[in-house]
């Protein structure tokens, strides 16, 4: 008898579920506040296409295609818009007028970063930033120059060893990463990760690169609260354990640094010094969490941009020749290449800016903002409150409406060349803008200028045949997932 009574129950459940889906589809298509924004109809009714996009490795290219089809604003999810208009960045992420609420970070995207500068609320972010600012000031950069130079010298010693006089290809991307992680470890904690010494990644570093896909997946799980526990079962076994181990490692390093008396001007010392002078405080877990963020953000992005710059230079021999001449005519000795003098290399700055345009560290979205109460105008469009808004840098940087020959690497566009007079160079903000822009921008530029100048001063560079498609083979899972960049480094 139970078997006969089960079918009506199943039919009722199925009918109810189907009715619910119909209601959701009809509402999202015809009654949702975003119903009038253009975009694929499937994206309007479910978050699944966007999630698959974020996990495919090519969200930047897919978003560009959507903007080419639908225009400067695209509905990429039931409650999510993507803008590639130059004015949208300022409207969403720029400074707000006094009394206006902030367009805050998407709670789901930053749910594990509430105790650091990445995901904290407005009040705590201000507190964290004021404390961290001491370690990133111009004066702090100059005080840390001996540390910069020591690691740059070690890098080029190792590159000379690895290149075998230019006869053996070297994965320069890997060596840049070794250097930036060692450098930021020393600047943050007063001790290196020893990547350059050991010619290998520290476990902390390797986890960041090996788990990019899983991190992108974890970031999307929260958008499906009803089935999140089941989706979590798909995360590789042991990954969460490794995350916990890295968090504990950060705590251990911060505790060790706090227990060590030193006059070296590292970040932890500068932060604690700044907290004392301001009469404010930071909990230990907050200090450790912020230090952990600085390690990844202050190293991976710099190494990525340097790798992109070297690739584009090798792919454009004339541009490489112009940069080489600028550097070698400026310096007679390698040790003269320093933080201050490299700021005067105009063509190098143009090369770095063009590399940042074509290979921005944040290329595929993944960091939306939530429109504040009352809604707001974004690039001339009124966007309702609680809408998630992406500012898609890559889709903007490659849009011919804003950049002439957008797919071509041409540093001259940054040097007043009349061919590019209408380019929206003001829209290239790879370090974001507003109160939450990247606090480490000056550090990144200092590292990039010194290392790239030294690279072209020390070596003639030639791309290995196996890395000809490095750019096309790069993938994005929150951050860039790069293949090896093998080059021949021929000593001068």
Swiss-Prot record:
Protein origin, superkingdom: Eukaryota
Transmembrane segments: 6-26
Ranges of biased composition (kind: Basic and acidic residues): 88-106
Phenotype caused by lack of the gene: Leads to the accumulation of isotrichodermin, a trichothecene pathway intermediate.
Function: The biosynthesis of trichothecenes begins with the cyclization of farnesyl diphosphate to trichodiene and is catalyzed by the trichodiene synthase TRI5. Trichodiene undergoes a series of oxygenations catalyzed by the cytochrome P450 monooxygenase TRI4.
Family label: Belongs to the cytochrome P450 family.
This protein's name: Trichothecene C-15 hydroxylase
Species annotation: Fusarium sporotrichioides
Source lineage: Eukaryota, Fungi, Dikarya, Ascomycota, Pezizomycotina
């Amino acid at each position: 008898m139970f078997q006969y009574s089960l079918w009506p129950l199943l039919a009722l459940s199925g009918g109810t579920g189907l009715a619910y889906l119909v209601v959701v589809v009809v509402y999202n298509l015809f009654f949702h506040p975003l119903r009038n924004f253009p975009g694929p109809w499937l994206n309007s009714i479910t978050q699944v296409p966007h999630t698959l996009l974020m996990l495919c490795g090519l969200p930047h290219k897919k978003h560009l295609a959507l903007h080419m089809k639908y225009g400067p604003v695209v509905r990429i999810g039931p409650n999510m818009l993507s803008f590639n208009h130059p004015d949208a960045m300022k409207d969403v992420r720029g400074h707000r007028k006094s009394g206006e609420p902030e367009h805050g970070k998407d709670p789901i995207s930053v749910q594990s970063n509430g105790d650091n500068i990445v995901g904290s609320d407005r009040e705590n972010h201000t507190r964290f930033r004021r404390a961290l600012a001491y370690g990133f000031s111009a004066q702090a950069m100059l005080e840390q120059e001996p540390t910069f130079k020591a690691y740059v010298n070690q890098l080029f010693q190792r590159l000379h060893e690895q290149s075998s006089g230019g006869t053996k290809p070297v994965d320069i991307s890997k060596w840049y990463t070794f250097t930036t992680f060692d450098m930021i470890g020393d600047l943050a904690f007063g001790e290196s990760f020893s990547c350059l010494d050991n010619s290998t990644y520290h476990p902390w570093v390797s986890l960041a690169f090996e788990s990019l896909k899983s991190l992108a997946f974890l970031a999307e799980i929260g958008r499906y609260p009803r089935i999140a526990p089941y989706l979590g079962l798909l995360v590789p076994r042991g990954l969460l354990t490794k995350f916990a181990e890295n968090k504990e490692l950060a705590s251990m390093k911060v505790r060790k640094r706090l227990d060590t008396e030193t006059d070296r001007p590292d970040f932890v010392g500068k932060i604690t010094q700044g907290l004392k002078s301001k009469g404010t405080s930071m909990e230990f877990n907050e200090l450790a969490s912020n230090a952990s963020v600085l390690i990844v953000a202050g190293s991976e992005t710099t190494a990525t941009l340097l790798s992109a710059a070297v690739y584009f230079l090798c792919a454009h021999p004339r541009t490489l020749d112009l940069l080489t001449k600028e550097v070698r005519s400026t310096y007679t000795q390698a040790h003269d290449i320093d933080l201050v003098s490299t700021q005067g290399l105009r063509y190098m700055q143009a090369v770095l800016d063009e590399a940042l345009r074509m290979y921005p560290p944040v290329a595929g979205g993944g960091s939306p903002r939530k429109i504040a109460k009352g809604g707001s105008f974004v690039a001339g469009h009124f966007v309702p409150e609680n809408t998630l808004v992406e500012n898609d840098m890559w889709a903007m940087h490659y849009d011919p409406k804003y950049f002439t020959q957008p797919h071509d690497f041409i540093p001259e566009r940054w040097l007043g060349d009349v061919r590019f007079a209408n380019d929206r160079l003001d829209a290239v903000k790879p370090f974001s803008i507003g109160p939450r822009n990247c606090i480490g921008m000056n550090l990144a530029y200092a590292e990039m200028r010194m290392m790239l100048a030294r690279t072209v001063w020390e070596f003639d560079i030639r791309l290995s045949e196996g890395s000809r498609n490095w750019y096309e083979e790069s993938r994005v899972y929150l951050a860039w997932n790069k293949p090896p960049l093998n080059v021949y480094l021929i000593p001068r």
